[in-house]
Amino acid sequence: MKFSFRFASVLKVRRYQKRKEKQKLGMLLNQKRMIEQQIRDLKKKCQHAFEQPQKQSALANRQYYAQKHSQHERLTQLKKQHRVLGNKVEEQRGKLTEAVKKMRMMEKLKKREKRAFVERVEHMDQLQQNEIAIQRYNSDY
C-alpha cells in the first residue's frame, strides 16, 4: 500500500503561493534598497556640490538656489516613495506570513494523515500476523 495525500494539489498550490509572495517581497525590498541608496547619494551630492562661494553674480546665485530647491524636492519625493514602499513591504510581509501559515497547516494535515496511514498499515500487518499465528497454532492441535 502506498500513501497518497488527498489534498496534494492544494498543498502544491500553497507552496506555489508562498514562493510567489516571497518573490514579491524580495522585489519590494530591492526597490526599497535602491531608493535608500538614491537618498544617500542625493544627500552626499547636496552636501558636496552646493557649497556656495562667497562672491557670485545674481544669475549664478539664482541658479544655485534653483538647483538646491530641485534637489530638495527630489529628496522629498524619494522619501515619500520610501515611505510608500515601506508600507507595501509590511503589507507583503503580512501576505507572506499568511501564505506560510496556510502551507504549514496543509503540511501538518499531511503529516497527521501519513501517521494515521502508517498506524493503520501496521495494525493490519499485526492482524495478519496474529491470524497466521492462530492458524499455525490450531493446525498443530
Description of each model-found segment:
Residues M1-Y141:
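Charge-rich amphipathic alpha-helical interaction elements
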